Design a protein with these regions (language model features):
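Membrane-anchoring alpha-helices and their flanking helix-loop junctions
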Residues: 1-65, 82-141
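Histidine-centered phosphotransfer motif of kinases
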Residues: 70-78
């Protein structure tokens, strides 16, 4: 199951990258640079040994509630979604919006699956969910 999530995610990213203009030099690139910084902050906040593209916890992993994880439980996914938003806005076609929707839907289902795995492995994740209430967007979801 975990391979299906990752495969779907990377196919959507590859299609958006192939058919869209990932790094055009327009004002959208500023958003992308800020989002790259968010992604780096998220990786640094969680620690090098705690993150993976797979929605299953690594051996020896722990729960991070600092840095970006103070605001949302999945800031790397937030960064990924926001990074590709300008790509879709530049392309502005039905196909790119559909693939973007598939990417977001894949990440939402992946988050739900991942959180179930985290609760099984880390009992403190239930407390973390109470402290950091939102999954992707502060104050929203």
């Amino acid at each position: 199951m975990k391979h299906i999530f990752v495969l779907s995610q990377f196919i959507a990213i590859a299609l958006l990258s192939y058919f869209g203009n990932v790094l055009a030099f327009d004002w959208y690139v500023m958003l992308q640079l800020v989002v790259v910084a968010l992604g780096i902050w998220a990786v640094r906040s969680v620690g090098e040994n705690n993150w993976s593209v797979y929605p299953t916890p690594n051996e020896g992993s722990s729960i991070s509630a600092t840095g970006a994880y103070k605001y949302v439980r999945h800031p790397m996914y937030t960064a990924l979604i926001l990074f590709f938003l300008p790509v879709v806005l530049r392309a502005d076609g039905f196909f790119s919006w559909t693939i973007y929707g598939v990417l977001i839907l894949t990440l939402i289902v992946k988050i739900i699956f991942e959180e179930r795995q985290l609760i099984k492995k880390h009992t403190e994740y239930t407390h973390f969910k109470k402290v950091t209430k939102k999954r992707l967007i502060p104050f929203v979801w």
